[in-house]
Amino acid sequence: MKKSIILSMALMSALMVNAGSLDKGVDRNNLDLTTTPGTDFYQYACGGWMKAHPLDPQYARFGTFDQMAESSREQLKELVLNLSKQQNAKGTMAQKVGDIFNMGMDSTRLNSEGAKPLMKDIDFVKGVKKATLPEMVAFMHMGIASPFFDSGVMADLKNSDVNLMYIQQSGMGLGDRDYYLDEDANTKKVREAYLTYANKLFTFIGYKKNDAKKAAETVLKIEKELAKAAMTREEQRDYSKQYNIFTLEELQAKYPNFNWKSYFSGLGLDNVNRVCVSQLDFMKKVDELISTLKEKEIKEYLIFKYIDAAAPYLSDAFNEANFDVYSRALSGKQVMQPRWKRSLNVPNTLLGEGVGQLYVEKYFPAESKKKMKQLVDNLRIALGERIASLTWMSPKTKVNALVKLNSFTVKIGYPDKWRDYSAVSVNPELSYWENVLALKKFDAQFSYSQLGQPVDKDRWQMTPQTVNAYYDPSTNEICFPAGILQRPYFDPDADDACNYGAIGVVIGHEMTHGFDDQGRNFDQNGNMVDWWTEEDAKEFQKLADKLGAQYSAEIVADDVHANGTFTMGENIADHGGLRVAYAAFKKTEQGKGNTLIDGFTPDQRFYLSYANVWAANITKEEILRRTKVDPHSLGKNRVNVALRNLETFFDAFGIKAGDAMFRAEEDRVSIW
């Protein structure tokens, strides 16, 4: 997950500033003038904002990035509320969006129905036998949940024009193996909350107290066994170790306790002849468990997985139990989001491009696409110049890097071709969960149907209304959805320094992902190919390890350190994004000069603008959760650790040896 913004070169060069004051860009109220840039730059740049925005109990983290997401959500709320109040023709996108939203808002009906909407399927799951387990797992994988493992259709890592079936580790409700294996107090608290949650769900569907307790313990036991065999998140950063190809016959021979042909048939796929198993040891454990677990234990595990998936779309009792573990225990949130936000998430995700098309028509200025392309082109030139001037890389590898850079596909705003939702319906006579499930199944069927088809490289991995951006190594593309192309990241009334420090860094960040510890293993066509000389690869790794060690040295809470290995790709992208955006900024008229605005030089405004992007308040629980599961560093480290490698940052604020923010030249890292 990555971030981005909109900006146009033409706009920026037209915004040259004279001495004076602007009310756009850097806001002095965001600063904490009781400290200094050389002591703690994050506190200096963001302390005022953090003080003015105490954490609302519905959030575990809230920052300027989240403010932007909230602005986008308010736009979506206005759009969807209007649709929900209209009489829309049956089968139209307006009808589907409006009706599914209204059903989520109908708390009276949801509470009166209780567990009733899922009981037919629960009875079906209760009938599973070991002989029919493959078909049952396939039933669950069609949009409901991912018991034991997960599967999906994606581009072949070594032949990006062809779709391939992947089998991957999953089945752990807490998301990460460490939540099952670590013994620190916070992790134990999370496990206890999860056990309590499972117990409640079983009682909600009629289990007696003692039976519910035993069933919950069975679920935790199975998931803990899966966790023991799971790859760590650090190990999962190495794609080469997760590319293990089997024919269907070879797959069956390797994991004989599961009928793979029956499983794939259950997914509607009779043409599976090549399968990639991403985590071999994990699937060995799954195969072992299928053999050794009692039928009753398998049933209880599958039943829990089903109820867990349905809980957010049922009565308040289910919602509150779900919130207690996944939000309160894991993240430190104190109250649930209002119902309208939760209800909005359904059409926004499960009818995403349909909502996105309506969103773009109403809120996205057509000229923004052109302006953004100009800015991306400018940043691409700056990165190309930096690659050409690298002292640690050989000419041969530089040529390959530049070929890849110049082959980037750029997607801006919204797709040229919209997804067709005409085959799925929303029926208000059915329950909310039944309708949500129909949408989820439609989505899963669409994904699985891509097997045997050429990779659709025009397809987007995010909806247009998403406040985010991404780089996809399999298509060598960078994408900036409409949702991120708005203030405060791109502000046409702000000066170049502020725009380059925000959106410019974001664009540079996405580009640098093509050359981070994962992206560098893919060529210009999106294939996993080694295009590096052996010596250059070693030099890159040496620099990356040095950067990773800087982050791992940081304590995030109590005695817990950041994980510089797990966050390596994002750290490299932040570092590269800063250097590339700064290089591009220095080509603007403002960047070439030294005119003060509000008492700050252009370079100071650039770095303040970057820091303000990451201003946020966050709970301790969320800090610990993100350190386990999020490949991005915490906001404070994205500012303080990244900037301490930049000599231009030291020069901008007069930071010298002896200041806490200073890093000696020999200890700094420069990769891209």
Label the predicted regions.
Residues T35-T39, Y44-R109:
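Active-site-surrounding "flap" and adjacent substrate/cofactor-binding loops of secreted or lumenal enzymes
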Residues M1-S21:
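Bacterial Sec-dependent N-terminal signal peptides
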Residues A69, V219, K254-N257, C276-L280, ...:
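Intrinsically disordered, low-complexity linker/terminal regions across diverse proteins
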Residues N30-K51, Y180, D184-T203, M568, ...:
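Hydrophobic/aromatic-rich, well-ordered segments within soluble, folded domains that form packed cores
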Residues L83-Q374, N378:
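Noncatalytic, helix-rich "gating/capping" subdomain that lines the substrate-entry/channel surface
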Residues R28, A52-D56, S151-V153, D176-D178, ...:
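Short, solvent-exposed loop/turn and secondary-structure capping segments
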Residues Q58-V80, N210-A229, N499-V505, D598, ...:
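Short secondary-structure subsegments characteristic of cysteine-rich extracellular domains
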Residues G20-N29:
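Short, Gly/Pro- and small/polar-rich lid/capping loops
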